[in-house]
């Protein structure tokens, strides 16, 4: 029975999501809220924690693999390896800390550098701690302007109230899925082109 269960899980499509952002912005809190419906306020700084969950995305059962990375500068070197394995990124900052918003540009540059060979990288900007509106330091218009400049979606979340938590993970998975479908289509197109070319050559030889 267990073997069948593992077999079924391994056959599911897997979407790999990387949590990126400065320390203390709530990356771990968002991840744990999505995974377990729990709000964890006091959390030890993360080096890298990995989570996997089976979800239903637009009627299809899939698996999401979430890697929660460290925001501290000490871990900048090892982040490259994590970024290489990722298929999509949630770039998180706290609306109560403008410095964390400014830092998103540097994190994005690191992602683009590591993923230089890829055309469009699935990425969302996430303004967390929307429940602390009275302490807001990042105007919504400023964050939206940055998202528009980068050609990505901007969503505000609260790991505490669970506002938009599911939305950011599911929206990112949809972007990852679209990219995979596009890449598969391109690959199949190239294979088809090669087959036709080979067929023509054989015809000429005959």
UniProtKB/Swiss-Prot annotation:
Q: How is the protein disposed in the membrane?
A: Lipid-anchor
Residues bound to GTP are 21-28, 68-72, 128-131
- Subunit description: Interacts with ralbp1 and rap1gds1.
| Stated family | Belongs to the small GTPase superfamily. Ras family.
Q: Which organism is it from?
A: Xenopus laevis
Domain of life assignment: Eukaryota
Tissues in which the protein is found: Weakly expressed in adult tissues and highest levels were found in heart, brain and testes.
Q: Please report the name of this protein according to its UniProt entry.
A: Ras-related protein ralB-A
Instruction: Name the Gene3D superfamilies on file.
Output: P-loop containing nucleotide triphosphate hydrolases
Q: For the modification Cysteine methyl ester, which residues carry it?
A: 203
């Amino acid at each position: 029975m267990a073997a069948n269960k593992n077999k079924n899980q391994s056959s599911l499509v897997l979407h790999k999501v990387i949590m990126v952002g400065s320390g203390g912005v709530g990356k771990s809190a968002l991840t744990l809220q999505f995974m377990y419906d729990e709000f964890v306020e006091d959390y030890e700084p993360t080096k890298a924690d990995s989570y996997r969950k089976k979800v239903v995305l637009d009627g299809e059962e899939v698996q999401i693999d979430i890697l929660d990375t460290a925001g501290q500068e000490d871990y900048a070197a090892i982040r490259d390896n994590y970024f290489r394995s990722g298929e999509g990124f949630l770039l998180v900052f706290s609306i109560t800390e403008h410095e964390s918003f400014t830092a998103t540009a540097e994190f994005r540059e690191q992602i683009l550098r590591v993923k230089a060979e890829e055309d469009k990288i699935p990425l969302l900007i996430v303004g967390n701690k929307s429940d602390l509106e009275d302490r807001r330091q990042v105007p919504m218009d400023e964050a939206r302007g940055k998202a528009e400049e980068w050609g990505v979606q901007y969503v505000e979340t609260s790991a505490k109230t669970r506002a938009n938590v599911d939305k950011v993970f599911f929206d990112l998975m949809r972007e990852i899925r679209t990219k995979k479908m596009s890449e598969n289509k391109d690959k199949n197109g190239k294979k088809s082109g090669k087959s036709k070319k080979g067929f023509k050559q054989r015809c000429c030889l005959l």
